[in-house]
Amino acid sequence: MTAPSPRPSPDPIAHLVARALDAVAAPRRAVIGVDPDGKHTAVCVLWSDGAVDLAGGGTRADGAPLCTCTGALATLRTVGLPAVAGVYVETQNPHSPWSAAVEPCRRSRYMWEAACELTASTLRPTAPQAWQRVLAKLAAPHHRTSTLSDYGPLADALAAQLGAKLANGDQRAAFGLALFGAHSLGWDLGPSA
């Protein structure tokens, strides 16, 4: 009796793209952490079917604090929601040790702007057509800061899906894909230096 042939390992590129498409096809809810006043506080924004709810300060039932942006990020990872937009931190002193510790959060400003526009939220003023900047950043190879050794195939796959969604006029889905790619791979969507 011959041994069964080993099952092929799943294609990580196809898996990530499928996960992204699933997230934007039926976004049950999503969470954004934000520091709205530069005082190291955080607010979680949850939306489902267009409804936006806010929760800030204190802790969640799972014990992850929402009073800091680091805690907000931990909450997003713990809850494992289908779409995570990111954290936007703004501080008066960009050279302070605290600011340096949350550099990945500070770089997510465009992600927060995009999420506001995506949810038609007025929680924070959003620059006109912020989604275009997000997609442009996603498409520009010199803006990618992924630690993966080979993100080219994934970038190409996401770009193809983005193009298809935009061609169909589905900007919301394209937005979700852009945010998914940025969050999952750690791409820098912040302003150019």
Where are the regions that the model predicts?
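Phosphate- and other anionic-substrate recognition elements at nucleic-acid/protein interfaces
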Residues: 2-193
